[in-house]
């Protein structure tokens, strides 16, 4: 559930900072292929929760979710997924790269 996800994410961020002092970048997931009937199709809620957590914990945030949707308006999901379900192919990984580069990496 979403509440468990956000609690676990907050715990991980706190622990990483306490134990390592490392910089933290949170990134959202991408939407699943809408043709996949067995997937979790509420990924937007998780993307928004991750963005909110980044604001609350003052972490960098890479918005893969909305960038993926913008590209998906011009390409089919199958063009970005290696298994046509939930694993990005090289183009899907390029989207992650582009979003992370905009964050400053």
Predicted regions and their residues:
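Alpha-helical cap/lid subdomain in secreted, periplasmic
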Residues: 1-105
């Amino acid at each position: 559930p979403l509440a468990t996800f956000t609690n676990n994410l907050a715990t991980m961020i706190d622990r990483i900072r306490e134990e390592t002092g490392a910089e933290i970048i949170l990134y959202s997931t991408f939407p699943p292929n809408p043709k996949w009937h067995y997937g979790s199709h509420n990924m937007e809620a998780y993307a928004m929760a991750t963005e909110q957590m980044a604001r609350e914990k003052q972490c960098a945030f890479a918005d893969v979710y909305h960038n993926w949707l913008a590209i998906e308006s011009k390409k089919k999901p199958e063009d970005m997924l290696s298994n046509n379900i939930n694993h990005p192919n090289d183009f899907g990984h390029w989207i992650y790269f582009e979003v992370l580069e905009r964050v400053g990496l």
